[in-house]
Amino acid sequence: MRLKALFFLAWLITSLPTAAQLSRAQFSSLENILGEKSSFSGHMTGFILYDLDSQKVVYEKNSQLNFIPASTTKLFTLFAAVAILQDSTQTLRYVASGDTLKIWGAGDPSWKYQDFFQPDFEKVWKNYQVIQYSDANQVSPAFGYGWQWDDYYYDYSAERSPLPIYGNLLEVKKVGNRPEVFPSRFQKSISTTTLPIKELERDLHTNDFKYSPTTFLGRERFIPLLTSGQLTAELAQELTGKTWIYKKESLPENNQAFRGAPVFPLLQEMMLESDNFIAEQMLWMVSDHLFQTLDTERAIEYIQKTYFFDLPDQPKWVDGSGLSRHNLFTPRSMVVLIDKLYRIVPEDQLYALLPTGGKTGTLKNTFQAAQPYIFAKSGSMSNHYSLAGLVRTKSGKTYAFAFMNSNFLGRPSAIRAEVEKVMALVREVL
């Protein structure tokens, strides 16, 4: 990690003259496409372009204003994970007690989630038949601060938990004219309804499910489970064949840490596919590494005081994923973050982590060009769209940028199309 010599960027961002490196023609081109007669005039827009070589701002517009970042929040989470976790996940903490192994989850999201490399749990519990599981180290709740309660039903809003299994999701498929679910233990929790619902739906407060035989479409999908320590123990017992007991017990000081899977594939999924669940669990692993508790707020506070004290504007940062509308960042703080990532993450890894326009991840179908030129994280929710990362121009230079839009009417896709026009212009004229 090359974390030193990164803490004068705030002064550079706030004190250097705007557009110091642009010709009159270049400046006019950007002013015209972003000005009062442009598609951006009807809502709040912030934009900044930063020369990574000279460390100068070359253009900015409203870069001092706060915006809801949505999933560009994951850039902050990425930095935290790279700085603290380094190469592997925090998986478990454990102590032996006679013939029983007592364990506490450390936030690792990888157990039976997608096709990720699996931690070698047998190293920890192979000599024990009884495992006592506790979640007493969990401080933050399952739902993040400011998340919308009625998103509980959607897979992008899976609950956080200390030792997730299956990503805390229920897989749903259609067999005949009825739903079939995995884990199959929940099949008995499905009942029918006369309400004309089109998919399997979960009760808000329980893991009970309903569907309508007459209107069921049965698209393959995932539904978040209502998590609990008891459910974790029951699922783990089915998977391991060992006896699991759930008992809430404080984590003792003499515990040992077990670090499990490689962290890079998880970071890639978080960034390329904008996986909210992984992002949230990343901050819990950071918290476990630092404090041996699962506390999002405390982890964020530590990262901000240790690594982000020099940002031009202190962000209001409340979760790992960007699901919360309480997150507020300025574009000029975003480019300082991009610069930090650019300098501490090896170049090949950084470009593998950032979605590439026309090639990978959430930007696969946008910013298409013969030679990729956008490497960035996007973020969107109703009335908000942001993009932050790196742009490579035809002159061969690479710039950091942040482009944030808030309070617009209509679909984010319309704003995204206009953002693409601006970035294509940047590519051409700089």
Regions found by a protein language model. Name each.
Residues 21-53, 57-66, 85-88, 124-129:
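Beta-lactamase-like hydrolase cores
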Residues 67-81:
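Active/ligand-binding-proximal structured segments within catalytic/core domains
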Residues 53-55, 65-68, 107-111, 137-140, ...:
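Solvent-exposed loop/turn segments at secondary-structure junctions
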Residues 58-60, 258, 283-430:
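Small-residue-rich helix-loop
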Residues 1-26:
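Bacterial Sec-dependent N-terminal signal peptides
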Residues 83-313, 429:
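Conserved serine DD-peptidase/penicillin-binding transpeptidase domain
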Residues 47-49, 93-95, 388:
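Short beta-strand scaffold segments in enzyme catalytic cores
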